[in-house]
Swiss-Prot record:
Main localisation: cytoplasm
Gene from which this protein is expressed: sarZ
Cellular component GO terms held in the UniProt record: cytoplasm
Residue intervals of the HTH marR-type domain: 9-139
DNA-binding region residue numbers: 55-78
Superkingdom of source: Bacteria
Keyword Cytoplasm annotated: yes
Family: Belongs to the SarZ family.
Key words of the record: Cytoplasm, DNA-binding, Transcription, Transcription regulation
InterPro entries: HTH_MarR-typ, Transc_reg_Sar_Rot_HTH, WH-like_DNA-bd_sf, WH_DNA-bd_sf
Protein name stated in the entry: HTH-type transcriptional regulator SarZ
Compartment(s) of residence: Cytoplasm
Molecular function, one GO term: DNA-binding transcription factor activity
Amino acid sequence: MYIKDSYLSNQLCFLLYVTSKEVIKKYTYYLKKHDLTYTSFMVIMAIENEEKINIKSLGRRVFLDSGTLTPLLKKLEKKGYVQRMREKEDERNLQITLTESGINIKPTLKAISDQVFEDFDISQDEKDNLVNSLKHVISNNFDYTTH
């Protein structure tokens, strides 16, 4: 589809919005088969295998607050992908780890991510340049450590 040259079509915010919406729509299509949302995908992929991470650190990693993460993690726990454990020394500190199922689904989720970008008419170089540009914008302009 061609975007007509206009004021709106030259606005970075609009272009990021459309791109994000369409990419997430593709992810949603593939993730539906695994009863996962895009946000669930992000959380599973953000937790390293064998890692214990608290909600605050996980939230910083995926740019989500604890109010959004808590119900999502409860759903992922019910589905068997993560385990939530309270620290014995500090009951307020909730640690999250991937279960065996969570670790085992990661290759499938990576394949979905690869498929999403294969579905778009974008070269590897274009993708790499876009990713690097967006990382630069995020790291130089947004501080999520306060959330």
